[in-house]
Amino acid sequence: LNDAVVDAGGRTHGRGGRGGSGGGSGSSGRKTGGQTAGLRVGLDGNWELTNPVEATANPDSSKWVFNLANGGRAKGWAYLSYTYEGKTKSEWYHFAEDGIMDSGWFLDGSTWYYLSMNHNGFYGEMVKGWHHDGQDGRWYYLDPSSGAMHTNWSKIGGEYYFLNPTAPAQTWFFDNATGRWNFGDINSRPYGSMYQNETTPDGYHVNESGVWR
C-alpha cells in the first residue's frame, strides 16, 4: 500500500506528499514553506473569482485566486487582512500550486486543517476551535493558535475530551475534480472525531457533550 494511504489518518492524500497521523495535542505543522505573511487586500493584491458563472449556480464550486500587486498569484499559506461589510479580519488561507484557494479539509504534511466553507465574505479562512462537520455530523477540535486538528486526549476550556487518534478504515475520500475531501458514509469512526456518550479505548466514560467526568 502507498504510505500516504496508510498514514493519513484514514484519508488518502490526493495531492501528493506524505500523509501522516498527526496526533498529540495538535501542535502546529502549518508553516511548511510557500508561506506569505501580512498581505493586505487592496494594497498587496486583490481577490479574483475565476469562474463567476459556475460559482453563481453553485457557490461551493467557487475558484478564488489572490493576485499579488507585484505580479503572480499567492501560493501556499498566506495571511490575509481585509474588511468585508464593515468586519475586518486577518487569517490564514491556503492556495494550491495553480493559485486556486483551498477549502474544506486540508492535509499539510502530517497535519489536518479545516478551511471555511461558509460564504460569509471570509470563505476559505482557517477555522479554529470547535468544528461540527456537516458531512459526517461529528465534532472536531482545531487548535486555537495553529488551526491544527487535535487528536487523542485534549484539555479544552478546563474539560477533557477524547478525539479519535486512529482510523482503521478510510472514511474520507479526495475528489480530484473538485479538489476537496468528501465523507464516504462509511460505518467507521473518522480520524480526529470526538467521542460522545461512550467509553474511550483506555477505559474512561465521556458524556453526551464529550466531556470526561
Go through the PLM ranges and name each one.
Residues 1-213:
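Extracellular adhesion/carbohydrate-binding repeat motifs centered on closely spaced tryptophans
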